[in-house]
Amino acid sequence: MLAAAHGAVLVPTVPPTYQALRQEVDRLGNAEARMCFYLSALFTATDQIQRYLSAGIPVVVESYFARCLANHRAFGANLSVSLPQGLPRPITYYLACAESERQRRLARRDKPVSRWDALAEINADKITDAYASFPMHRVTTTGLTPDEVLQAVLSTDPQGEQASADTQHVAAHPHLLPSVPRRTEGAYGA
C-alpha cells in the first residue's frame, strides 16, 4: 500500500533466490548464522535498491538493517557489525500499537508460528528497546485500519523531529542509518 501511494517499487529484503535457503537457515537454531544470512540477503537487496534509486525510482521495503540487527541481538547473536558507507539511507517508520492490539493482530495471522516468531515474542521488550536506538518515526496504529495506518504514515513529516529516536548524531554510531536521505547526485554511482 505504501509503495503504491508513493509510486514506488516494493523490494523484498529477502530476494527470491534466497527463499529456499531461508527455510533451511530458519530451521537451524544458530542466531549468528541466521543473522549473517539475513545480512547477506539485505546487502543483495541493497544492490537492487540502489539501481532503482539511481534511476530515480523510489523504493519501499518492509524491513531493513535496523530490524535485522535489533532482532538478532535480542535472539542472542553476539556479532559486531559495522555497516559500510554508501548504503541507501531509509526514512524508517516504527509502527506501534497497544499490547492488547498487538496480541489480537498476532492471533489473526494466517501463518504457522516459527521458533523465531516464538523467540521474538519472548524477547519482544528487548527488540523494542533495540529499536529505540535507531532513528525512526513512531506511528501509533492502535485501532486503525490498514488504510488509516497508511494515512498516518503519509501524514508523518519525514524530516521532522522523531520523538522516539536517539538524538545522537547518526554518523557517530556505526550501526545506524540516518532517517533522511543525504545523497548528492552521483554519490552512489550509476
Identify the meaning behind each predicted range.
Residues 16-18, 67-68, 146:
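Positions that flank functional sites
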Residues 1-2, 153:
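Hydrophobic residues on the short alpha-helix immediately C-terminal to a glycine-rich phosphate/catalytic loop
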Residues 84-98, 104-152, 173-178:
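Small-molecule kinase domains that catalyze NTP-dependent phosphoryl transfer to phosphate-bearing small molecules
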Residues 151-190:
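C-terminal accessory "lid"/substrate-recognition subdomains
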Residues 2-47:
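Conserved substrate/cofactor phosphate-moiety recognition/catalytic segment
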Residues 35-40, 70-72, 115-117:
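Short, flexible loop segments at the rims of nucleotide/cofactor-binding pockets, characterized by
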Residues 45-111:
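ATP-dependent NMP and nucleoside kinases share a basic, alpha-helical "lid"
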Residues 5, 55-56, 134:
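Structured helix-beta-strand junction loops
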